């Protein structure tokens, strides 16, 4: 049985902001579309693959409930509880994601 994906409102906002930034600021509508499509395709893998990606740890090697997968420069942070996968954030990889997630 496949996992069910649940996007948080913030994750959906992140996707919109990524698209808008590439489309408007970088003036590249094709790259904007391709980037969002690539991120969504990488997230779709979570339907069939359990707990893939890297575990997120805090300083001091403290565990968190998060894992992340990467598409190009973007990191998708998610939690998996049984067959439910919660997509919480999609963040540019060079940002301080610890602060954004736990800040």
Model-derived regions, located:
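A short, surface-exposed loop/turn module that caps and links secondary-structure elements
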Residues: 44-70
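Short, charged/polar surface micro-motifs in flexible loops or helix N-caps
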Residues: 41-52, 83-85, 93-96
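Generic secondary-structure boundary/loop-capping signal
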Residues: 2, 53-55, 59, 63, ...
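A short, hydrophobic secondary-structure junction motif
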Residues: 10, 39-45, 69-77
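Arg/Lys-rich, positively charged N-terminal/basic patches that mediate binding to nucleic acids
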Residues: 1-38
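Secondary-structure transition/capping residues
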Residues: 22, 29, 33, 50-57, ...
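Enriched for short, Lys/Arg-rich terminal
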Residues: 71-103
């Amino acid at each position: 049985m496949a996992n069910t994906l649940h996007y948080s409102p913030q994750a959906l906002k992140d996707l919109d902001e990524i698209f808008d930034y590439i489309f408007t600021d970088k003036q590249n509508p094709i790259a904007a579309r391709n980037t969002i499509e690539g991120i969504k395709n990488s997230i779709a893998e979570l339907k069939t693959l359990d707990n893939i990606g890297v575990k997120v740890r805090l300083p001091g090697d403290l565990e968190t409930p998060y894992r992340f997968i990467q598409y190009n420069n973007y990191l998708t942070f998610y939690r998996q509880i049984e067959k439910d996968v919660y997509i919480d954030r999609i963040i540019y990889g060079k940002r301080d994601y610890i602060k954004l997630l736990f800040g």
